Amino acid sequence: MTITPQQLIAMLPLLIVGLTVVVVMLSIAWRRDHFINATLTVIGLNLALLSLYFVGQVGPMDVTPLMRVDGYSMFYTGLVIIASLATSTFAYPWLVGYPDNREEFYLLVLIAALGGILLASANHLASLFLGIELLTLPLFGLIGYAYRQKRSLEASIKYMLLSAAASSFLLFGMALLYAESGSLSFVGLGQSLSDSMVHQPLILAGLGMMIVGLGFKLSLVPFQLWTPDVYQGAPAPVSTFLATASKIAIFAVVMRLFMYAPAADSEAVRLVLSIIAVASILFGNLMAISQTNIKRLLGYSSIAHLGYLLIALVAVQTHELALPLETIGVYLAGYLFSSLGAFGVVSLMSSPYKGPDAESLFSYRGLFWHKPILSAVMTVMMLSLAGIPMTLGFIGKFFVVAMGVSANLWWLTGAVVLGSAIGLYYYLRVTVSLFLSPPQSLVRDTPSNWALTAGGVVVLISAILVLVLGIYPQPLITLVQMAQPLM
């Protein structure tokens, strides 16, 4: 098969990030320089982000049988690259105090970003699996990067063992689907899995196993047990990547699979997804109430957020595609910027070897009296995650509720409202502790000029975006409406 210039342009983000991986590798081999490698990484990711403009000019197409580049894949590629950029900028000050090799961190982030970009345009079960593995394997190394701390190493081992088990479930599920349908591409699966076939035991078993594998990666109940431990043990910049890029990329590919394959029409599959969604919303929110560690709290809250999103998957079948797709785009954009801001503040407050990460809620007590702007940012992020009006998080929640109502999913909509009410409590708990009187004994190691560091700039931009798009969301909604998949 000959590749035309148009197809090369359509693959630009993948090619640029892949090239950056090679350049950073050679640069590490030539001379270890933390600053140079961090700069190369950021330049490469920015070029990949800019290249999306040219990708948009060539129009939607199937580049290879494995990849379909369209507005949908461009939107999620953009989100993944933004998350990777933020991770790299948060990691720089964190790594400055790190005694061992620092440069490999950026290499792992780039490889994981490559997996995320592949997932955003995956159109075939092979590229789905390749993308998920490319995304997960570097995460083992990233989670255990501060391996001299017992917690980080333990988190890495937990994630690795469970992830391997989940991947094997996923592969076996794919094998069963292939055995029954004889096709691995999403569109081919959609054509061969006609309504009569969905009820065959092999197909249902295959779908069930794929739900287990993907549910683990998205940390949905009951496959969520690793989430709080890993979020807590991983370095703060890595938790950022785990909460944003990996979840967004995998959710994007699951959504695409559901659009093409009518497995969605099966009542059994929808029932299972509805139960998982309600369980995730309630479990995530209820468990977060008692947490005193902010990373664990954000870990549990991410379980709940993916529960809200799962409702869009259930609504895909009952409804035309436009509203669920818009909902997912708006919600994930809001979730991305809110999480980047929240984890960014945690990263700015933590440094690897000056005592433990500032993760306990106690270390945020009275932060307002020392760092008023930083605590204002944290407040905005918490309100956005809770879905308070005038923030981007509210627009996302509003779309979810509107979609649930229009698809007549009353139970699920009720669960969203209930979950948001519970969520309000623990998000406000974090916010209130920022404004209490500060304890005497606490030493803070945030740099006094944090707003001038790269990480500080990312956090401030996230806060501004969350507020501006929360008040006037039209630009984002227009962008999401343009990001339609090629059917």
UniProtKB/Swiss-Prot annotation:
Example of a GO biological process term: ATP synthesis coupled electron transport
UniProt topology in membrane: Multi-pass membrane protein
Top-level division of the source organism's lineage: Bacteria
Keyword annotations: Cell inner membrane, Cell membrane, Membrane, NAD, Quinone, Translocase, Transmembrane, Transmembrane helix, Transport, Ubiquinone
Catalytic activity: a quinone + NADH + 5 H(+)(in) = a quinol + NAD(+) + 4 H(+)(out)
Cellular compartments per GO CC: plasma membrane
TM stretches of this protein: 8-28, 35-55, 78-98, 104-124, 125-145, 159-179, 203-223, 235-255, 271-291, 297-317, 328-348, 376-396, 409-428, 451-471
EC number: 7.1.1.-
Record GO terms (molecular function): NADH dehydrogenase (ubiquinone) activity; NADH:ubiquinone reductase (non-electrogenic) activity; quinone binding
Primary location group: membrane
Subcellular locations according to the entry: Cell inner membrane
UniProt family annotation: Belongs to the complex I subunit 2 family.
Subunit structure comment from the entry: NDH-1 is composed of 13 different subunits. Subunits NuoA, H, J, K, L, M, N constitute the membrane sector of the complex.
Main function: NDH-1 shuttles electrons from NADH, via FMN and iron-sulfur (Fe-S) centers, to quinones in the respiratory chain. The immediate electron acceptor for the enzyme in this species is believed to be ubiquinone. Couples the redox reaction to proton translocation (for every two electrons transferred, four hydrogen ions are translocated across the cytoplasmic membrane), and thus conserves the redox energy in a proton gradient.
UniProt protein name: NADH-quinone oxidoreductase subunit N
